[in-house]
Amino acid sequence: MPTGCEFPMIKTFENALTAADFESTVELTNFPAVFRGCASVWDAYSKWNPFNSGLDYLEERAGSVEVEAMLSRTAPVFNGDIRSHERVSLPFSDFIRFCKQHMRGKGNGSGVDAKSADLNPMCEDYRPGQIYLAQFPILNDEKEEKVLLKILRQDIQTPTFLDAKSLSSINFWMNSAEARSSTHYDPHHNLLCVVSGRKKVVLWPPSASPSLYPMPIYGEASNHSSVGLENPNLSDYPRAEHSLKQSQEITLNAGDAVFIPEGWFHQVDSDELTVAVNFWWQSNYMSNMPEHMDSYYLRRITRSLLVSKPSSTDLRHLSEHIDQSRIEMAEGGNDNIGNESIKKGLSTLHEKASLHDLDPSASQALHDLISLVHDHVNAVDTSKGLQHTSPSCSEGGEKSKFLVNAMSCLEDDRVAHLLWNLEASRLRDVLLAMALELSYLKLLVKMEIFVLVLHKIFETLEALILHMLSPIAAEVLTQKFDEIDQQTGEEDRTQFFREFYSAFDDEAAAMDIILSRKEAFAFQVCSLASLCRLRTYHKLKGEKFSASY
């Protein structure tokens, strides 16, 4: 259904296309297309249907698999921004029981909020409608160890027009109650197939970006829109008034599929008990852009922007934008999300995490961190230094200090330098040991047990993250987190991050600080790139250019 779009109507194909026809008439145009009945020939079309014993089938086939789902406190809206949702692990069988509970509730008119007595105790903190099993891999060409639902692969078929494609991933999507995704784009071509239920998809071309206000490119959710589809705040986002004129809406019933080209914004509404599968693959354009050509393409793009000869007014607006962005970053403004602590279980990681069992290099790193942090703590008023406020409400001066130092050399930042030189596995053990000991100390305090301890050991983790983490150190820390992800099994990885963040009184604030300072680092990189563009432009015109930064 059109929604006032000024672009050609999205084509609908009732019959299957050949690979050649798909590439020439659909893919190369970078325009969406709908394929009716594309998935109706799959075994999954009948076997996964929740209203035809599909839930029993899925539970029998994969019930023991530990899946990772999105938890949204603002359900039915599920926002892809990492600050707006949590990732929770639970057995697939528990999620299936959520779905069965929803069906029973709808059947007797009692609603879906009642808790089920046979659910995992970890599930007690949320309602079934707050859980969305989103983007869980059936196939992944880079991370085979994360493909835990591969047993369902035999129930689906890759459409014939994708046979020649090198698929990067196939993902499973399922929701018990109605769900809405935030508006976003993906860096891959996408074929979204509805197996059961119904989805409504609103699509915008990349040219609609100004009306959708994408989040800052230096942020962790740069592919997401800042604007809600319904009732956007036009005082904050005046161009959003025109967004629907650039969009088209389609409805996918069971068996239907839609091709969503890379870069196209889309927002998806899913009916209750909808099951879907999507295929991601790299576009021909991106496949034909080898990395050794990146610098050349970047220069060509920059040159094409310069050829447009911006007016002096444009340049002034650009400079003002940089200054305003600098101020906004200094003032914070990131909303903290409610992030209740998940009940902790025992893991083999605990056995490695004792302060006394660290290997010599890890022990030395811990000693260096303690000395470094408490040299800093002793230099400030400790009555204030160990009190935390989130970046959104902290004083601008401290945030500005971090911003100014964002691009300092790695060697000049003692925290960043120490983190950089520490192997990811040892850093994991050090952080986990500190987190577990801090949690234990807080437990003793709550129990009013007085213990003579060296508080500096336990204070180090909070002081390090909440007060000493510069932007460049946050960038290094998150890179180390990525390495830990790659080197650690699923269960231990989940346990590590659970233990690490649960050591803080405000888990969401700790995560927000790490993300905010990582984004501050990326913001400075982007700002420097903008200044370089200005400098290059003036150089081409034979003019002098100076900027205080």
Swiss-Prot record:
Expression across tissues: Mostly expressed in leaves and inflorescences, and, to a lower extent, in roots, siliques and stems.
Domain JmjC: 125-296
A UniProt-annotated Pfam family: Cupin_8
Gene Ontology cellular component list: nucleus
Alphabetized UniProt keyword annotations: Iron, Metal-binding, Nucleus, Oxidoreductase
Gene3D superfamilies per the UniProt record, alphabetical: Cupin
Enzyme type, top EC level: oxidoreductase
Protein name as catalogued: Lysine-specific demethylase JMJ31
